Amino acid sequence: MQSVLDLNTNAHLPVVVRDSRITIGHTTYEVGAVRITESASIAFSQLIAGWSTSPIRMPLAGLVFQVSKELTSLGHFFPLIHILDSTQRSEFRTRLNTLLQNNNMNITYTTATGVITPPLIMRVLVLGQIISCFWGRPEIIDALQQTVPSIALYADRQHYERAGGVGGGCYLPHEHRIMLESNRLFEGFYTPIPNVSPFLHELGHMLDGTHMRLERLPHCYGRMPLMRPIDVSLWQKAKQREVHCYAAWYHQRPPANGQMPIGHPYVFQNDGEFLAGHWEMFWRNPHTMAQMTPHVFTAFYTYVNQDPRDWLSHDYTGYVDGNRAFYQSGQQPWPSELRYDVTPD
C-alpha cells in the first residue's frame, strides 16, 4: 500500500534507511512519497538514495531539499517562507543563489579527507538563515559580505577541537570566523517548533565582529553593523533597562513586580554575549520577549525591520523557562561585566 506523507506536519522527523526501507519518525515504509506542495511529491526511493549518499543526518525537510531542490521544502528551517507570496519566494531564491555564488561568504567543511565544499543543504541552511534574518534590511547582508566572513563546519567533535574549536560553537573575532560542528546546524530542527540554534547565536557574535571591522574598532563592542541613530538609541535603552533589572537580582533586591531579566546570567558576562544571547532569543521566542522585555524586542524589531511573530505562531520556551528557573531558585547571579552602552547603577 502506497503511503503519502505531508511535509508540513512531518518536516522535523528523523530519517533512517535500512534494508531498502525508510523509517521516518517511528514508522517504516517500503513504498510511497512525501508531498512537498499541492502539485509536487518526492518518492521514498529518491529519499533512500539521497540518504545513502549524504555525509550527515538531518530531519526529513533537509533530506527532501537535498534531493528535490524545492524551496518550499525549507519552510521548517526558514518559516519566513510560509508568509511570502510567489514573487517574494522567487526573490528569496534569487538572493540565496547570489550568496551561494559569492566568494566573500566562505563556507568550508572539514572531514577526514580534508577541507571541502559542504553539501548544498549545509550551505543553504547557513545562508538561508542569514537571508531570513535580514529580509527587511538586505543592505546588512551586503555589509556582512564586505567584511569577508567565514563559516567553518566540522564533520565531528574531533576535527572541531583539533582546529581550535571550544564549547558548542564559537566565533573568532580577529579571524571573523564561526566554527561549528556540522550536526549542530540541524540540532534544533528535530521538533515541530525549532528550538536551540547555535548558528544564530554565533551569527550574533559575527554581527558584532562585522561592526568592529566596518567601524575600524580595536575590539568588539556588542553592537550590530549599520545601526542607525534610532537603532543605537533603542539598543542603549534596552540594554540599560536589562542591566538595571539584572543588578537588582544580583544584589538580592528583585523588583517588587517580580520582573526578571529574560537572559541567563551567562549573557551578562560581556557585551558580546549580551548581544548574541538576546539575538538568538529574538528569533526563537519573540512572543515571550515582546511581552516580558518589550524594550529589547523593539530594539531588534526596529533594527531588522521585521517581526518574527508574523511567521512563528509559538515560541520555543526552553531558554526562557530555564532562565526563569535560575532567578527563582535563589542562586546568586554572576557579576555583570558589561562595559558599553550602559551606565553604572
Predicted regions and their residues:
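Non-catalytic architectural context of zinc metalloproteases
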Residues: 5-116, 249
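Short, hydrophobic/amphipathic alpha-helical patches that form generic packing surfaces
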Residues: 79, 98, 123-136, 273-284
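Auxiliary, metal-adjacent structural segments of Zn-dependent hydrolase domains
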Residues: 93, 101-179, 187-191, 306, ...
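A short secondary-structure junction signal
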Residues: 162-165, 182, 189-194, 208-211, ...
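Active-site recognition of the HExxH zinc-binding catalytic motif
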Residues: 194-211, 276
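Pan-zinc metallopeptidase signature
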Residues: 254-345
